[in-house]
Amino acid sequence: MESNRMINRILVATDASAASNRALEMAAQLSTQYDAELLIIHVIRDMQIPFDIKEIPELESDTIESFATAREEIMRKVAESVLRDARAKAGKAGASKVETTIGTGDPATSILDVAKRRETDMIVIGTRGLGKLKGQILGSVSRKVTNNAETSCLIVR
């Protein structure tokens, strides 16, 4: 069923930072205003174990593998918790059609892929998240998303 509304599906990225929480609040308000679906994404960054660490004789490959598996499990549980909280906040703000998804890898690439695959009409993102360069006006993820998105973007301060 095709809708005549301009905004039918909104994607908002969250990392539980203050900026992403403000973006979530704005996206939830827009979702309510436009009766649009709200898709919330949290991205787990790929953090490969450096190849040269595998060359250290004291570290057995089983130990390295166990560490990688434990890290992945912890990051997935963190993502699930972040998304559970985000869904609750969106609901409190009035959003009724809310979905969550976990992305992996480079955050900007993952956000852009989901936006394209899910045919979102708008991406809402905070100015900067939990990255290292706090003094920047736009974070690297926000910049990459807005520069490469095929849809409208709203950057929330």
Regions found by a protein language model. Give the residues of each.
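Structural beta-alpha unit
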Residues: 1-6, 73, 77-123
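Small/aliphatic-rich secondary-structure junction motif
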Residues: 2-64, 93
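Short secondary-structure boundary segments
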Residues: 42, 127-128, 157
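Short glycine/proline- and acidic residue-enriched helix-loop micro-motifs
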Residues: 62-74
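Glycine-rich, Arg-bearing micro-motifs that act as flexible, cationic patches
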Residues: 116, 122-147
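Short, flexible loop segments at boundaries between secondary-structure elements
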Residues: 151-156
